[in-house]
């Protein structure tokens, strides 16, 4: 491609495909902009920053990934035909995929606003755009003036036919039994997200090590691009620590805070920590050094948080004891109630320590499938898992809305359960699982997995196997590390890793890992996976005590299902002109009917009675005429030789004029009229052609039993030309004369 704008371009081969990174062609007024391309898929990633005019205690990073419909040659389906409104679920998930590995790499204390936008501007529908957006966003930040520790490379690693493949096409990835998205820096992995079909833990560990080696060329590209076109970084100096405040606060708080951190109940511990802070603050305000400058105490919260982190970590490393008194491998007590809700199709309460979820399953028809507008066209989704995290679950007051975190946790639980679902052919219901977090003290997404599995089984969904999930943590200091099983919320915040693993007794179905430290040795990864398997098997055993297998029958409140097979040729008849027939069936019965081109019809109804009625009405259109059976037929056509009548939908028969009445009929219309209903008997079926008799029905009414021989079509008598006799001469008719009997000689008429 000709370089018209003086752009800087780099290429590299990664996973057998050429990756292009370019800057200087588009969005030159952004602080950093990168065009990243693989095949026909292009993502434009931009970074902008500006200082805030007010002081805040957090890093205001915003990441938005957007799929432009023009990228795939499509027009948005919205009313305004624009990409407006809230982002799609995929856009939200990819935005999180970019945010999670990048956010920890900005310097602590940096509070400038930073906005990262990743726009898909071309999509070939073969090369996925999510990992390109991650790589391009990292490269754009590297080029910008925003301080950033190191580049991050993203890639998809799949196992296809037993072999690892890096960044496969969308078609290839659909065949994989392991599909992971990884993000890594030069030294280690920093994020993992993916799903699997019962893959052993050892295979996942191998895939992650292999992926880290394979993504190094992408890191090289970003560093080279930075050398070619990078801007000078903002000179950021972290705020100076108030050492006097720190020393005095720690001296006042250490003993009381250590005691508060041994309170096992979450809310009581929260109150105890709050009391410690208030006590320390009151004591410091009595100190002349702070009494005159109370604004110095603004940093007290951060100082106590750092002290809390140090106390908790040291206790775990030295004593092997955690905040709630457990050792490093023990899973919190589990309590399960199946069938908790009387009217739900399936429900379960899953409680693990102070984390509790109410999970509900609802069955629907195929018309309830989620339909989405995407770059690949209109797609449908038959299984949905929605995770809700209301503010009361943590005793807080907040606006109620669906957050990105809730969407992400729901997607993780959905991936965990999807591999065990029955196929649409064997179980054509649409499935919606909702996890309502009732209480939360860590691992609520894994409670959604466990409760979701139980809820599906309670609903009678024939899952292949139960699924359980566990969240693993890590405490690492120098060369010493400890892996934690079933982490609390505080341990998640104070630890170095959040590694969620879900699966069956056979293998893993979903993983999600976020790492807060620079490197994760293979030994740590292996131990985390092994401990997670032990915990998962323990949880599955507890679940089996309550509900060892799916219910044998669906709830009486669930939709009733009947599947019938009909001749594909009569589908149009069942539907009717403009959908007239199918609408009449659904209106009369309240059923939902899904018709496939193969002739397979799924009938969903609220009750068995309405299902039976709908089935009967559908099968009415698939009837076949039976010899000797009487039918009420409608006259469709009057002919000289008889009448054409409709005896069944899409089936017509001929009533010969001789079969219209017991007496001789001169004209068909003397007996029947167009549109008239008449009682007839089928007297002949031959090669798809049907003959009927009104006469036979009339004779039966007179007590004369119908004899097929009486109404069968008489065989035609052979016509022998010799039987016609001699035509004889013309007799007294005279000569025919000339041409055409007009007399005279031909020449005479000239």
Curated annotation (Swiss-Prot):
Its main location: cytoplasm. SUPFAM superfamilies: Eukaryotic type KH-domain (KH-domain type I), Nucleic acid-binding proteins, Polynucleotide phosphorylase/guanosine pentaphosphate synthase (PNPase/GPSI), domain 3, Ribonuclease PH domain 2-like, Ribosomal protein S5 domain 2-like. It is found in: Cytoplasm. Mg(2+) binds at residues 492, 498. Its cofactor is Mg(2+). Its EC number is 2.7.7.8. Residues 705-750 are annotated as: Disordered. Residues 717-750 have a biased composition (Basic and acidic residues). Keywords: Cytoplasm, Magnesium, Metal-binding, Nucleotidyltransferase, RNA-binding, Transferase. One of its GO terms (molecular function) is polyribonucleotide nucleotidyltransferase activity. PANTHER family: POLYRIBONUCLEOTIDE NUCLEOTIDYLTRANSFERASE (PTHR11252), POLYRIBONUCLEOTIDE NUCLEOTIDYLTRANSFERASE 1, MITOCHONDRIAL (PTHR11252:SF0). Involved in mRNA degradation. Catalyzes the phosphorolysis of single-stranded polyribonucleotides processively in the 3'- to 5'-direction. This is Polyribonucleotide nucleotidyltransferase. The gene is pnp.
């Amino acid at each position: 491609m000709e370089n018209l704008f003086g752009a800087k371009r780099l290429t590299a081969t990664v996973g057998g495909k050429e990756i292009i990174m370019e800057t200087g062609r588009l969005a030159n007024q952004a602080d950093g902009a990168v065009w990243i391309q693989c095949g026909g898929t292009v993502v434009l990633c931009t970074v902008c920053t500006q200082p805030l005019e007010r002081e805040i205690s957090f890093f205001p990073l915003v990441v938005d990934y957007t799929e432009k419909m023009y990228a795939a040659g499509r027009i948005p389906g919205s009313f305004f035909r624009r990409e407006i409104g809230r982002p799609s679920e995929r856009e939200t998930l990819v935005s999180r995929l970019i945010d999670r590995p990048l956010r920890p790499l900005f310097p602590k204390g940096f509070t400038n606003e930073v906005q990262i936008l990743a726009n898909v501007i071309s999509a070939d529908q073969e090369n996925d755009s999510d990992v390109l957006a991650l790589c391009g966003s990292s490269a754009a930040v590297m080029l910008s003036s925003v301080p950033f520790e190191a580049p991050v490379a993203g890639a998809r690693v799949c196992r296809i036919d037993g072999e690892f493949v890096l960044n496969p096409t969308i078609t290839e990835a659909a065949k994989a039994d392991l599909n992971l998205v990884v993000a890594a820096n030069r030294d280690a992995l920093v994020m993992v997200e993916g799903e699997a079909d019962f893959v052993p833990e050892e295979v996942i560990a191998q895939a992650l090590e292999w992926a880290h080696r394979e993504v190094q060329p992408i890191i090289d590209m970003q560093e080279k691009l930075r050398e070619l076109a990078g801007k000078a970084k903002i000179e950021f100096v972290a705020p100076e620590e108030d050492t006097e405040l720190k020393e005095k606060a720690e001296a006042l708080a250490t003993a009381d805070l250590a005691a508060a951190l041994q309170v096992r109940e979450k809310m009581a511990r929260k109150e105890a920590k709050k009391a410690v802070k208030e006590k320390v603050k009151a004591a410091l305000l009595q100190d002349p050094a702070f009494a005159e400058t109370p604004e110095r105490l603004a940093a007290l919260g951060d100082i106590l948080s750092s002290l809390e982190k140090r106390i908790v970590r040291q206790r775990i490393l030295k004593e092997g004891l955690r905040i709630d008194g457990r050792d490093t491998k023990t899973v919190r007590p589990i309590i399960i109630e199946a069938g908790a809700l009387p009217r739900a199709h399936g429900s379960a309460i899953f409680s693990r320590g102070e984390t509790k979820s109410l999970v509900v399953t609802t069955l629907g028809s195929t018309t309830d499938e989620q339909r989405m507008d995407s770059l690949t066209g209109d797609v449908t989704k038959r299984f949905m898992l929605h995770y809700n995290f209301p503010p009361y679950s943590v005793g807080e007051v907040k606006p109620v809305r669906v957050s990105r975190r809730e969407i992400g946790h729901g997607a993780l639980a959905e991936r965990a359960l999807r591999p065990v679902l029955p196929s649409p052919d064997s179980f054509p219901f649409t499935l919606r699982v909702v996890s309502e977090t009732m209480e939360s003290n860590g691992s609520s997404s894994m409670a959604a997995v466990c409760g979701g599995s139980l809820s599906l089984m309670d609903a009678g969904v024939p899952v292949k196997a139960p699924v359980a999930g566990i969240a693993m943590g890590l405490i690492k200091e120098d060369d010493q590390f400890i892996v934690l099983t079933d982490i609390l919320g505080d341990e998640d915040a104070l630890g170095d890793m959040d590694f969620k693993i879900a699966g069956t007794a056979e293998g893993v179905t979903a993983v999600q890992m976020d790492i807060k430290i620079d490197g994760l040795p293979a030994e740590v990864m292996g131990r985390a996976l092994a401990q997670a398997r032990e915990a998962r098997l323990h949880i599955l055993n507890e679940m089996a005590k309550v509900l060892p297998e799916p219910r044998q029958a669906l709830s009486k409140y669930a939709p009733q299902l009947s599947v019938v097979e009909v001749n594909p040729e009569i589908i149009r008849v069942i539907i009717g002109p403009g959908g007239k027939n199918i609408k009449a069936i659904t209106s009369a019965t309240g059923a939902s009917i899904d018709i496939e081109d193969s002739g397979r019809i799924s009938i969903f109804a609220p009750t068995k009675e309405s299902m039976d009625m709908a089935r009967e009405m559908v099968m009415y259109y698939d009837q076949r005429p039976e010899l000797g059976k009487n039918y009420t037929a409608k006259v469709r056509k009057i002919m000289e030789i008889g009448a054409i009548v409709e005896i069944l939908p899409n089936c017509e028969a001929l009533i010969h004029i001789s079969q219209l009445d017991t007496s001789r009929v001169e004209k068909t219309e003397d007996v029947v009229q167009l549109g008239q209903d008449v009682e007839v008997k089928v007297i002949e079926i031959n090669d798809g052609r049907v003959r009927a008799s009104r006469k036979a029905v009339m004779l039966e009414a007179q007590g004369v039993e119908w004899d097929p021989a009486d109404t069968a079509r008489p065989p035609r008598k052979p016509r022998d030309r010799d039987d016609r006799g001699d035509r004889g001469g013309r007799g007294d008719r005279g000569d025919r004369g000339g041409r055409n009997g007009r007399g005279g000689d031909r020449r005479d008429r000239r």
